[in-house]
Amino acid sequence: ITKAGTEFKTVPSRTFAMGHSNGGGFCYALWRFRPDAFAGFAPTAAKGSRYAGPVKPFYIVASRNDTIVPYAEQEASFKDMIARMKMEEKGTKGRITQYANPDGVRMEIYIDGGTHAFAKDSVPGMVAFFRSLL
């Protein structure tokens, strides 16, 4: 992370981690072990709240028909995160449910009816969420 930051001249306040499946699990690990290196995280088709790090912005993508990482396990992870970070539901727009905590840290959860495949239609919302944090 340090080498990439130096080589590509990135700064943590403008750097986000995103990963799908195992990569999504790695996003959760980065949240726990290197939270200072990222402004926010976007795990997709993953579970991982056991890595619980400090309060940070999250855009989570989960699919109800995922047979590799069952939706119930993904849901348990994000419900745990909602409770740990003291998030309150702020509304729903389409497939995205928005949350914020009393300090203004935000989380959005995109839920679709797909399988374990990456939900490409989640990308515009993810990009908009990250841009809103800059």
Write out the residue ranges for each language-model feature.
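Gly/Ser-rich "nucleophile elbow"/oxyanion-hole loop immediately N-terminal to the catalytic nucleophile
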Residues: 1-22, 32-37
